[in-house]
Amino acid sequence: MQQYSILVLHGPNLNLLGKREPNIYGSVTLDEINLLLSEEAKNLDVTVTCVQSNHEGILIDTIHQAWGLHQGIIINAGAYTHTSVAIRDALSAVKIPTVEVHLSNIYQRETFRHHSYIAPVAIGQISGFGVGSYRLGLLAIVEYLRKLENNH
């Protein structure tokens, strides 16, 4: 069985987790999320590389660089979820299976958050489970990749 490498992308303002609107996003920091993902990755015998940026171009460049390096992507694009055709196009271009995750349930929030440019190019979307959304996203992408491998 192949050992997969998963890129985890955190978008704008996620560096403020634990401080920013804890009533919506919880009190867990981004470093704690990354640690949780690293521990879960070990249990699944995969590796994760976590990148956070507040800049759309850096996120796009990181997606481009993932081509041939990572077999899966987990992305929480933050507010770019609802605005960035460029991130959507980058994900579509590299054709790496992607799971979109959100800490909060974006469909229970403001109407402008109900639309995702990423969802149509992702294999799935997980939202509303707090930190668990990331863990579920990792489990989902690994299961997807293993099924894909077994079918070939």
From Swiss-Prot:
Point out the annotated site residues (description: Transition state stabilizer).
Answer: R20
Pathway assigned in UniProt: Metabolic intermediate biosynthesis; chorismate biosynthesis; chorismate from D-erythrose 4-phosphate and phosphoenolpyruvate: step 3/7
Against InterPro entries, the record matches this protein to: DHquinase_II, DHquinase_II_CS, DHquinase_II_sf
Instruction: Write the Enzyme Commission number(s) for this entry.
Output: 4.2.1.10
Annotated keywords: Amino-acid biosynthesis, Aromatic amino acid biosynthesis, Lyase
Q: Which Pfam families match?
A: DHquinase_II
Tell me which residues this entry annotates as catalytic: Y25 (proton acceptor), H102 (proton donor)
| Residues that hold substrate according to the record | N76, H82, D89, L103, S104, R113
Described function: Catalyzes a trans-dehydration via an enolate intermediate.
Q: Which family does it belong to?
A: Belongs to the type-II 3-dehydroquinase family.
**What is the name listed in the Swiss-Prot or TrEMBL entry for this protein?**
3-dehydroquinate dehydratase
The gene is: aroQ
